[in-house]
Structures are given as structure tokens and as C-alpha cells.
Amino acid sequence: MTTPTAVALEDAKVAFRLGDGRVYTAVEKAHLAVAQGEFVAIVGPTGCGKSTLLNVAAGLLKPAAGSVRIFDRPLAGLNRDAGYLFQADALFPWKTALDNVAIGLEIRGTPRAEALPRAQKWLASVGLGAFANRYPHMLSGGQRKRVALAQVLIRDPKILLMDEPFGPLDAQTRQVMGNLLLDLWNADRKAVLFVTHDLEEAIALADRVVIMSAGPSSRIIGDWRVTLPRPRDIFEVRLDKEFHALHREIWSVLKDEVMKGYAQSTQAAEAV
């Protein structure tokens, strides 16, 4: 039986009109398909449109050309099948960890008496069962990310859109969060589209690694399948010979785009 395609971008183009009337094309002719249960990571230079593609999949941006399909249906408006985990915390500072997780159900009409036990269960699943009554300012960066992850997963989205969710964390905490994410993902294998600047993180987590070119008019220029066995341990998989071979292969392409992006940003700064 064919695995359903959760997200499909066909020749998607994203353009913005600038203040001086010019049109800036961020992404052009993007073709990307994510199967149900597949974990796909997007890597590319700063400003190449990685987050832009994620916003298109979320329905937050409408492409100027091309199409977006979610489970073989044209996307019209917000993607109701997706949960979005941002780089910045989206926690309410005046609410406890428990209330921050429960609110995702409450705003959809779930009675509070039902939402709270479910929120407590999700906090326990991310290792924070004993921290339910703490406020965000009382939690570490990694703990806040766990709350944010539970906040998204409690709504049981079919698709996870993740925009550098572990970017602000230190290297060790990022690896801990990576293992936690894989454990939760292995439980029900949602479709995941994960944006990161970190090629090692992408290879360690994903089934496929997609590379974008430097912008403007960024395109998808490479798509590598990661055949490292699962389940994976983020701490151990980076020592694997296959991991290093794949990293070298992808970096040989990505490095050129990173340098192009750096040169373009330097020229733009000098022109100001």
C-alpha cells in the first residue's frame, strides 16, 4: 500500500513586494514531498528561505505560484493538520507549565477538567511531571522547550513543523532534546519538516536531508536519504562511519552555498 503524502509543494514560488516597489523572490520552483511518518530536515545558508518554506506548509504564506497539498488536498488557509514549534518560546509567562500545555485543548473547547489531566500526562511524557506548577521563568531553556513540545503534541497534529526549535540551547541540551524528540516521534511517526542550520543535527534526526541554495530565488538543490538504522541515539550516531561519510558528501555541496550567502550578505552590507 502506498504511503500517503502529508505535505507536497509543487513548483512553489514565494515573493515579497519591498517598500520601494521592487519584488524580491525568496524561493523559486520548490518541489518537496514529505510522506506520512517521514522525518525531513531542511538545511541551507542563513536567509535562504528555509523558514519561508515552513510557513508555506503551515498556510501562513501563500505562494505566488505553484501549489501546496496536504494529504492530497489543496491547502486553503491555515494548515489545520499541522503543529508548529518555533525557535522562540511561545509560552505564556503568567501561566504554569501545566496551564501552558492545557491551553491548546481549552481554546478548542475541551473542558478544563478534561484538559488538565491530559496536560499532566504530556508533561510526564517529556520528563516534567514534577514541574507542572512552575512558571516559565522558573524553568531552564531546555525545560521550556519540553513544555513547548508538549504544548504542540497534546493537540495530536498529523504534521510537525519545526523551525530551529533547539537553536537557542547549548550543545548538550540540544542533543538531549533531539533524543527526546526521536523517542516521541517513534511512538506514532508523524510527518516532520524540521528546519536547522546544523547539518550534524539534521543527519542525526532525519530520514532525508534537503539542501537549499543561497538566496535570493533559492531552490532545493539536493536531497539525501539517511540510511542510519533506527532507533538512534543522538550521542552515539555521530560516531558512526556512515554518519561521517554522509556529512562529508552533503557538506561538499552545502559549503559552496554557505560561502555564496556570506559573500552576498557582505556585499549588501557594504552597499548600505
Question: What do these predicted ranges mean?
Answer:
Residues 66-77:
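Conserved ABC transporter NBD signature motif
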Residues 135-139, 143:
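Conserved ABC ATPase signature
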Residues 95-102:
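Short coil-to-helix segment of the ABC ATPase nucleotide-binding domain corresponding to the Q-loop/switch region
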Residues 154-158:
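A short, proline-enriched helix->beta-strand linker immediately N-terminal to the Walker B motif
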